[in-house]
């Protein structure tokens, strides 16, 4: 899901750095959208990212993070600007989960499984280079990612036109440098 989103909204450096990792299947990803008390209203988020030099410090909590305890990376929506209007002031980051200040706690389900987590952030660090798109423009990025989640790869393959423009292999070759 995050690969097509980075293709659309990421800069060239992000594409060259992140897409090969995804294409090689290195590293599991989780989604940091839902928050306690917000229900299905994703724009009611309270997790913040505050600038600190060349990085942002992330504080808050996410809930229902699928496989958060086993993921290396999270794509996350955070509040970076005013709360009103609530769809503004949201930014989209990729976040390394293996760092101090990130605590993913499995939620024990009645079935005995623990696929979902509640994830806590206490001064977790995201580099400025890990912001996808522009400051406070993350709501657009997050909505687009949800479209990829719901529609699969059709948007990548067709560019949204319904006609084939490229293949996933073509995209992987471009950013991974492999012509095989």
PLM feature spans:
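A short, Trp-centered hydrophobic/proline-enriched beta-strand micro-motif
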Residues: 25-33, 77
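Short loop segments at secondary-structure junctions
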Residues: 9-11, 52-54, 79-83, 97-100, ...
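A structural signal for short hydrophobic beta-strand segments in well-ordered beta-sheet cores
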Residues: 47-50
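Glycine-rich beta->alpha junctions and the first turn(s) of the following alpha-helix
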Residues: 102-180
């Amino acid at each position: 899901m995050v690969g097509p989103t980075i293709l659309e909204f990421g800069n060239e450096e992000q594409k060259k750095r992140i897409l090969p990792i995804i294409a090689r299947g290195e590293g599991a990803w989780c989604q940091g959208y839902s928050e306690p008390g917000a229900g299905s209203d994703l724009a009611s988020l309270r997790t913040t990212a505050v600038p600190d030099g060349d990085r942002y410090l992330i504080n808050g909590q996410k809930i229902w993070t699928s496989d958060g305890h086993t993921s290396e990376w999270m794509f996350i929506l955070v509040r970076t600007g005013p709360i009103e209007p609530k769809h503004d002031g949201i930014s989209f980051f990729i976040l390394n989960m293996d760092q101090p200040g990130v605590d993913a706690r499995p939620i024990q389900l009645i079935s005995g499984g623990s696929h979902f987590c509640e994830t806590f952030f206490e001064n977790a660090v995201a580099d400025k280079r890990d912001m996808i798109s522009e400051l406070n423009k993350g709501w657009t990025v997050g909505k687009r990612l949800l479209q990829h989640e719901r529609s699969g790869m059709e948007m990548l393959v067709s560019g949204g036109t319904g006609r084939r423009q490229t293949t996933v292999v073509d995209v992987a070759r471009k950013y991974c440098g492999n012509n095989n």
